[in-house]
Design a protein with these regions (language model features):
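Conserved nucleotide-cofactor-binding alpha/beta core module
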Residues: 72-191
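Class I SAM-dependent transferase core
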Residues: 1-80, 88-92, 96, 109-120, ...
Length: 212
């Protein structure tokens, strides 16, 4: 379904600087409309964020593509995702061969997305907990992607990143953030690149924003 719309989305992503052919193929093959409410299916392949309920959104396709291209996951890489949401980003990473561990703090959304993964046949490790604390049981990770904007970079996530791994997280206020791309170069040392202007839902948790 929506073959023409999916091809048009790929053209849009190319125009915005997404050049990794593996990433573009993932966006062509993974059907975004399956991750949003049926009433919004007609908007699934427009380059916009969309509401998915529970005061959450599915991110703009370009944003997901940008983070995925920066991460550039290789088959077998262990990737931790903070903020499962609709599940779309996790499935993109899974399609590219990564072993994905994903954390969602909203219990109702966790249940819905867990059921969706089961229905679609995706084997993604999913947990309902405070994402700012990470998932120490399976650390270290080759990459960590945070899909919500925080006031700072959680210490636990830095600790759970493998040497040479990348941590991608939007940092700023509750309305707008800059993407921080950290590559771990030593036990406590990182090379950091910062890219403006993004807008994510707030990262709630012990090392994030408080509820309210």
């Amino acid at each position: 379904m929506y073959e023409k719309e999916r091809q048009e989305l790929i053209l849009t992503l190319r125009e915005k600087g997404i050049t990794n052919e593996r990433v573009l193929k993932a966006f062509l093959e993974v059907e975004r409309h399956l991750f949003i409410p049926q009433a919004l299916h007609g908007h699934a392949y427009v380059d916009n964020a969309l509401p998915i309920g529970f005061d959450q959104t599915i991110s703009q396709p370009y944003t997901v593509a940008f983070m995925t291209q920066v991460m550039n996951p290789q088959p077998g890489n262990k990737i931790l995702e903070i903020g499962t949401g609709s599940g779309y980003q996790a499935v993109i990473l899974n399609y590219l061969g990564a072993k994905v561990y994903s954390i969602e703090r909203n219990h109702n959304l966790y249940l819905r997305t867990s059921q969706l993964f089961d229905n679609l046949g995706y084997r993604i490790a999913l947990r309902c907990s405070d994402g700012t604390l990470g998932w120490d049981e399976f650390a270290p990770y080759d990459g960590i992607i945070v899909t919500a904007g925080g006031p700072e970079i959680p210490t636990n996530l830095k600790k759970q990143l493998a040497p040479g791994g990348k941590l991608i997280i939007p940092v700023g206020d509750r309305k707008s953030q800059k993407m921080h791309i950290l590559q771990k170069t030593g036990v406590d040392s990182f090379k950091t690149t910062i890219v403006p202007d993004f807008s994510f839902v707030p990262l709630i948790g012990r090392e994030g924003w408080k509820i309210g």
